[in-house]
Amino acid sequence: MSVRRVVILGSTGSIGMQALEVVAANPDRFQVVGLTAGSSAGQLAEQAERFGVRETALGAGDSERLVRSVDADVVLNGITGSVGLGPTLAALESGRTLALANKESLIVGGELVKRAAAPGQLIPVDSEHSALAQALRSGAAGEVSRLVLTASGGPFRGRSRESLRQVTPAEALAHPTWDMGLVVTTNSSTLVNKGLEVIEAHLLFGVPYDRIEVTVHPQSVVHSMVEFVDGSTIAQASPPDMRLPISLGLGWPDRVPGTGLPLDWTRAHTWTFEPLDGEAFPAVALAKCVGVAGGTYPAVFNAANEQAVAAFHAGAIGYLDIVDTVERVVDAHEPQAELTREGLAEAEGWARSAADRMLGR
């Protein structure tokens, strides 16, 4: 393959830094031509100097302008939160291949993003959706029976709802598998993140919500599965390492040799799968309802959750109040008739204000 010119959005975050590792290890495949960050100007400057990058930007607005102006083959969106929607649309509208780690932009943007994307232009970087994309190569679209997303279960797997009432912010940040930021790690503990991933899977692959399931897999080795109509199940398995889906996102449809360590089949392995406890973790069922409703509901779901997570880490509310607040805000929402960027921003603003009012902030 020829050298691909890459723009990395959110280069100072976890995904962005691992993407730079992939690029550094494969100079014959990738060249960084643009870097952006939210606020870490010093770190961004260091990265630009290291990789010889002239085009940099701070903030989502400048990131969007950079995406439209820089001549690139692939844009990796590693921004956290719905502020990534503008850069996502900019990449798609500019004809770049979009390696998407910023799930919120797809979930919030919904049909706006789908309409902007040409076939094969949007490549998922989330480990679960990268796994699904790989497994879906094994059959035709009409042969797919179900998508099965795996979840580690987070740090509170096996606990009852009542026992979660006293969870502290520090406990919520102790993820058993992945090293992520504050919001994503908290979302993984509440399983809001898995709920968002269900919506993302529907939008990416067009499979109805009643054929998308979640199973708990504590070892986090099987990243997702596709069940076909003949009863076959195709799974993608690898040791947990985000560099693998990142490299696939940058190189798709080609694989990048030597990106991750293979499983060691000379030793015994135990992989377990168990049903999700919907009573203790209602976020997945709520997210499915939100996804079915569509429109501005996913934007409201995501924004209300961000406000509730911030309140939890500020010590203003309890752990169970996070998802309870999101549900109350979603129930109070009156959707807009037409989906536009302006309408989405308005719905998000309403959701944040509504969440704050309900939380007494």
Swiss-Prot record:
InterPro entries: DXP_reductoisomerase, DXP_reductoisomerase_C, DXP_reductoisomerase_N, DXPR_C, DXPR_C_sf, NAD(P)-bd_dom_sf. GO terms for biological process: isopentenyl diphosphate biosynthetic process, methylerythritol 4-phosphate pathway involved in terpenoid biosynthetic process. The keyword Oxidoreductase applies. 1-deoxy-D-xylulose 5-phosphate binds at residues 103, 127-128, 152, 175, 188, 193-194, 197. Keywords: Isoprene biosynthesis, Manganese, Metal-binding, NADP, Oxidoreductase. Mn(2+) binds at residues 126, 128, 197. Its EC number is 1.1.1.267. It comes from the Bacteria. Its cofactor is Mg(2+); Mn(2+). The keyword Mitochondrion does not apply. HAMAP family: DXP_reductoisom. Belongs to the DXR family. This is 1-deoxy-D-xylulose 5-phosphate reductoisomerase. It comes from Leifsonia xyli subsp. xyli (strain CTCB07).
